[in-house]
Amino acid sequence: MSQVILDLQLACEDNSGLPEESQFQTWLNAVIPQFQEESEVTIRVVDTAESHSLNLIYRGKDKPTNVLSFPFEVPPGMEMSLLGDLVICRQVVEKEAQEQGKPLEAHWAHMVVHGSLHLLGYDHIEDDEAEEMEALETEIMLALGYEDPYIAEKE
């Protein structure tokens, strides 16, 4: 049986109102076992300052972002189940959900799904890659009982 081990780190000044660990686990379980037997993922929920700093250091972007994905590269010849880390910025997720008129829980789920697909090697730089990744995200989100996260862009 496929298993995803979650290491959840809540690093916000105020951690109240965040999704429960079981919700993060459900969202990971909807994505990763399709691609990998056993995995370990760290999800770190942060405030804007940490997100901003990491986004500047690793992507050269001088602002906080919704989710950063840090895939773990296993050295050749070693077998490890560590898939990588997701860093999700609470304030950006909350602001985007409000601006886009999406339920907050659905947007959190989407950020976990989106980031997990990045950990698995998916990207959206090229149009064809973006199309494939968005189709997978939509399929997973619908299976979880949420709306298509890209519905507004398709209308």
UniProtKB/Swiss-Prot annotation:
InterPro entries reported in the protein's UniProt record: MetalPrtase_cat_dom_sf_prd, YbeY, YbeY_CS
GO annotation (BP), single: rRNA processing
Enzyme class: hydrolase
Cofactor note: Binds 1 zinc ion.
UniProt entry tagged with the keyword rRNA processing: yes
A GO CC term assigned to this protein in UniProt: cytoplasm
Disulfide bonds: none
Required cofactor names: Zn(2+)
Residue sites binding Zn(2+) per the record: H114, H118, H124
Residue spans crossing the bilayer: none
Superkingdom as given in the UniProt entry: Bacteria
Membrane keyword on record: no
The enzyme's E.C. designation: 3.1.-.-
One MF term in the entry's GO annotations: RNA endonuclease activity
This protein's UniProt keywords: Cytoplasm, Endonuclease, Hydrolase, Metal-binding, Nuclease, Ribosome biogenesis, rRNA processing, Zinc
Subcellular localization, as worded in the UniProt entry: Cytoplasm
Alphabetical list of Gene3D superfamilies matching this protein: Metalloproteases ('zincins'), catalytic domain (3.40.390.30)
NCBIfam families xrefs: rRNA maturation RNase YbeY
Entry function: Single strand-specific metallo-endoribonuclease involved in late-stage 70S ribosome quality control and in maturation of the 3' terminus of the 16S rRNA.
Family per similarity comment: Belongs to the endoribonuclease YbeY family.
Record protein name field: Endoribonuclease YbeY
Species this chain originates from: Escherichia coli O17:K52:H18 (strain UMN026 / ExPEC)
Gene transcribed to yield this protein: ybeY
